[in-house]
A protein has these predicted regions:
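Loop/turn-rich, solvent-exposed surfaces of beta-rich toroidal or solenoidal domains
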Residues: 263-316
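Beta-propeller domains
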Residues: 53-91
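Short, conserved, GDST-rich strand-edge loop motifs in beta-rich repeat architectures
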Residues: 54-68, 129-130, 179-198, 279-297
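Short loop/turn segments immediately following beta-strands, especially the blade-tip
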Residues: 142-150, 249-252, 306-308, 350-352
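Beta-rich, blade/repeat-based domains predominating
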Residues: 37-48, 65, 89-119, 154, ...
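Blade-level signature of beta-propeller repeat domains, shared across WD40, Kelch, NHL, RCC1
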Residues: 325-352
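Beta-propeller blade signature
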Residues: 67-76, 137-145, 197-207, 296-307
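A short helix->beta-strand "capping" segment at the edge of beta-propeller domains
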Residues: 23-39, 152, 312-317
Length: 352
């Protein structure tokens, strides 16, 4: 069904075309690449280690036959490898925590999209993944980075409603989560409606032992990236369809949304060590000005003050950069790492 949605008469810059195959891996100015990771839509650091985790979406959204992956990246020597499924995927189901999970993940039919990490002890983490494929679910893993190289095991899942194409997830203190509904795959033309600024999704919340529930009043156009404050009180969301950053207090009912308009189609939202939020996305161009399948618009990185929602453009690259369709930007050390949902590489550049 998703494939049918994407046979469009107009190429929407955020999602159409621009898939990069194995061409040269030369830098685009200050932007350097690690070539090989396919559709690495999201990137997160494993604490203070030298390791990064990236997602790897399957080809469902961009009409390719790519399979889903989770990648491990060494940010010091700039190498990567497949972490999951790998040669021998490990399954250690936590049936008490994830009692509604019907079966282990199918390593041949999943799509690792958005990521969230929670540290549970020294160099041990829970990883939550918005996943598509055989089922729409939050797939949960445990990563142990105490040894020479991190290991991963699948531990459970939380099935999501079947009228939901999820995008991003953020973990709450009790092991629950908030997750964005990007669009409804059961509604004809729901995906395209995002780019008309129409309501297509909202925010859901889940807690252990409970059900996945809508947070009323969070209806948005293309609810995409999501982040929560340290006290779990404030939620920040990227609304791609209306090109907005949203903030609300999840402890209040009904919620009241604060909004700020931005110049890009914002994707993932990530915290930096400086206490600021960072987002990236394709530079906005009206669809009727970008009709060809190879149309690229470049992308920009924005820094957002979580208190005022004031945004500042940090840097960006035009349509000539080899990496296009940027979906995540996260400062790690003295670098910013860039992911894309449509390509064969991740990028990194010195933090300006």
């Amino acid at each position: 069904m998703i494939r049918k949605l994407l046979i469009l008469s107009i190429c929407i810059p955020m999602f159409c075309g621009g898939q990069i195959f194995a061409d040269e891996c030369k830098p685009s100015g200050d932007l350097r690449y690690i070539c090989g990771p396919v559709n690495a839509e999201d990137i997160l650091p494993l604490g203070n280690t030298k390791w990064l985790i990236t997602s790897g979406m399957n080809g469902q959204l961009i009409n390719t036959h790519d399979k889903g992956h989770i990648y491990l990246v060494n940010r010091r020597d700039k190498t990567f490898e497949e972490l999951f499924p790998g040669k021998k995927p490990v399954f250690r189901p936590d049936k008490k925590m994830f009692s509604a999970c019907p079966a282990p993940i199918d390593p041949e039919n999943f799509s690792a999209h958005g990521l969230a990490l929670k540290q549970i002890s020294t160099n041990r983490f829970h990883l939550y993944v918005t996943s598509h494929g055989e089922r729409e679910a939050i797939e949960v893993f445990e990563i142990d980075a105490q040894g020479r190289k991190p290991t991963i095991s699948w531990t459970g899942c939380v099935p999501l409603p079947d009228n939901m194409f999820s995008n991003s997830v953020a973990i709450l203190a009790d092991g629950g989560f908030v997750v964005t509904k990007f669009f409804d795959p059961k509604v004809p033309d729901s995906f395209n409606s995002i780019f008309e600024g129409k309501i297509t999704g909202c925010i859901y919340e889940w807690h252990p032992g409970g059900r996945v529930k809508v947070i009323e009043g969070t209806e948005l156009s293309g609810a995409n990236g999501i982040a929560v404050s340290k006290d779990n009180k404030w939620v920040y969301v990227a609304a791609s369809g209306t090109r907005e950053i949203i903030r609300f207090n999840r402890t209040q009912s009904p919620v009241k949304l604060s909004r700020v308009r931005v110049s890009i189609q914002p994707d993932n939202i990530r915290w930096g060590d400086d206490g600021m939020l960072y987002t990236t996305g394709s530079n906005y161009v009206p669809p009727d000005e970008c009709k060809s399948s190879d149309c690229n618009t470049g992308w920009s990185i924005l820094r957002i003050d979580p208190e005022t929602l004031k945004t500042i453009r940090v840097t960006g690259f035009d349509q000539t950069a080899t990496l296009q369709k940027a979906s995540t930007a996260i400062p790690v050390g003295n670098e910013i790492w860039i992911g894309t949902y449509s390509g064969d590489r991740i990028g990194y550049l010195p933090e300006p």
